[in-house]
Amino acid sequence: MEVSKRHHTVPNFYLKGFGSTDSKPKIGAVSLDDGKRLVMPTSNATVRKNFYALDGHPDGADVFEKELSRIEGDASAVIRKAVEGAWSLSREDREILGTFLTFQFLRGPDTRAWMDQTQGTVLSKVITQMGAEGVRKTLARSDKEVSDEVQNRLIQQAVEPDGIIMKTTPAGHIRHILELVPELVRYFVGRPWVLIRFNRKKLFTCDTPVALVRDPEQEDVCAGVGLMTAWGISIPLTREVGLLLSNPMALVEEAADRKTPRELLEDVISGRYDHEQAGSTKMAQLFNSHTIANARNWLFHHPDDADLVPDELPGPRNREVESEVISG
């Protein structure tokens, strides 16, 4: 059986929602690295060779890629229903789409870079605090033999701006995904969902399309935002349809004297508070601005929408962890 080596970090079916409608759909792409604009087949966008490969797995190195394809197939059918007018979703469809969004939130190179940088930052701090002599004494007591050259390189890298460079394996990344999905999916399905249909305005997408939205009333624009604290989560589904997982706190405050948190959560998951609305200029700006800000290396758009992409774009986002290395 042929083993797939071309792994999409954003599914091809999803990118087709922003592509041309010919037999081999194409999508506009803007590189945040050099500003270059091009048109490519959707099947070639966000492809990384062996990104999820599990070498030596009895079911083939592409076993996780195949599992993602299964999840994508189920989600594709649900998104198609929503785009074609079936809203709100059944509980089963909501859980399918919520699970897909959780996987998408975790599966990209941004998460792997975060893992690399987190481990590298921690190790750099530990080595810097120990000092060269402490590192050598610690390594001398270990079972593994580490050459002086490697020791010196680690000590030197620890005090450099980027610290020690770590590389997470596909297996480590996949383990991280599978551990977190059951925990994080609640923060997707447990929000009121708003489907927004745009007529004149068009949406973009990017290589990390699930974006966290900060509370618009938040005065500190530099404050961090996490999955639990985000005011909302925006996901452009196609160039004309966006999905906003909105803030549940208003519901909690409104129903606090009538329902327990568990009862309210059940109501939310049932879709009782979901609704649909027509897109506005302000809402299109919310989606597109968060898509642009959340992109790491590539912004994508329908080939006919190239003129709508701003000339001024941020550069590539390579740092996922901002932490100063402790000097010692």
Predicted regions and their residues:
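Alpha-helical structural context detector biased toward long hydrophobic helices
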Residues: 1-6, 12-328
